[in-house]
Amino acid sequence: MSNKKLILKLFICSTIFITFVFALHDKRVVAASSVNELENWSKWMQPIPDSIPLARISIPGTHDSGTFKLQNPIKQVWGMTQEYDFRYQMDHGARIFDIRGRLTDDNTIVLHHGPLYLYVTLHEFINEAKQFLKDNPSETIIMSLKKEYEDMKGAEDSFSSTFEKKYFVDPIFLKTEGNIKLGDARGKIVLLKRYSGSNEPGGYNNFYWPDNETFTTTVNQNANVTVQDKYKVSYDEKVKSIKDTMDETMNNSEDLNHLYINFTSLSSGGTAWNSPYYYASYINPEIANYIKQKNPARVGWVIQDYINEKWSPLLYQEVIRANKSLIKE
């Protein structure tokens, strides 16, 4: 009788142990699977919880996102910062787009880089973003919008009024403000306003953006924002500024109310040897290596020139991988 009881106890203990092992294995498989979803660059936001603020997520973006159609070699040296179109950028992980517009005499907005017309309209960008979000509803697109050049003669309204009456009325735009959470932003375009004269709420509002500086300001009443956007400095000073801002971001990784925006771009010196392409070919992999070595929990919003697959390690991929700490096991 005692042998039967012993056998029964051993059977029960074995069953419990095996169940625990399989449960632990399944949990680890699910966790690994969720982390691996970050490697799907079109859907990398999918495993991140809805409750996480966008300010806390490490997000890659592109600087002067609409410059990819420039054909003239001189204009390319001076003004080209991206070689692939919006959909390529989105499919390769970019979720922040630096859109700079000019109001035309037919009261539409076209994209500019300084005085350079980029042969792209704001409608084209919005339509591309809408299609991407339809295909990938787990994602969000953050559109930084700046008035880049003086209005054409004959424009009937202001830049801000035209945008808000003709474009921002589209329901694709998120109309709430505050410290925006990913769950509210999925499937939406979130506006970051770098233009003045806004009369409509929505997105990140009331931006103070001094030129060629690293600065901290407050938006939406309660969110602090630190921006590193030094673009007319030496190569060494630029790299130091990027790393200093990234270090501050890493050290404040749990501050959900502080957004860090870090531009890796340098302006052109007018030749092939100091063009945005040339600088990006060195800066992008250097900063990617820096992230890789630090293995951080957060690097902020990192805005780069020339998102591509040429310079290993790839900056946008290392930025996205920093989000693995947000995925719950």
Swiss-Prot record:
<feature type="domain" description="PI-PLC X-box">
    <location>
        <begin position="53"/>
        <end position="194"/>
    </location>
</feature>
<keyword id="KW-0456">Lyase</keyword>
<feature type="active site" description="Proton acceptor">
    <location>
        <position position="63"/>
    </location>
</feature>
<keyword id="KW-0443">Lipid metabolism</keyword>
<protein>
    <recommendedName>
        <fullName>1-phosphatidylinositol phosphodiesterase</fullName>
        <ecNumber>4.6.1.13</ecNumber>
    </recommendedName>
</protein>
<dbReference type="InterPro" id="IPR051057">
    <property type="entry name" value="PI-PLC_domain"/>
</dbReference>
<keyword id="KW-0442">Lipid degradation</keyword>
<dbReference type="GO" id="GO:0016042">
    <property type="term" value="P:lipid catabolic process"/>
</dbReference>
<feature type="active site" description="Proton donor">
    <location>
        <position position="113"/>
    </location>
</feature>
<feature type="signal peptide">
    <location>
        <begin position="1"/>
        <end position="31"/>
    </location>
</feature>
<dbReference type="InterPro" id="IPR000909">
    <property type="entry name" value="PLipase_C_PInositol-sp_X_dom"/>
</dbReference>
<keyword id="KW-0732">Signal</keyword>
<dbReference type="GO" id="GO:0008081">
    <property type="term" value="F:phosphoric diester hydrolase activity"/>
</dbReference>
<keyword id="KW-0964">Secreted</keyword>
<dbReference type="GO" id="GO:0004436">
    <property type="term" value="F:phosphatidylinositol diacylglycerol-lyase activity"/>
</dbReference>
<dbReference type="GO" id="GO:0005576">
    <property type="term" value="C:extracellular region"/>
</dbReference>
<dbReference type="Pfam" id="PF00388">
    <property type="entry name" value="PI-PLC-X"/>
</dbReference>
<comment type="function">
    <text>Cleaves glycosylphosphatidylinositol (GPI) and phosphatidylinositol (PI) anchors but not PI phosphates.</text>
</comment>
<dbReference type="InterPro" id="IPR017946">
    <property type="entry name" value="PLC-like_Pdiesterase_TIM-brl"/>
</dbReference>
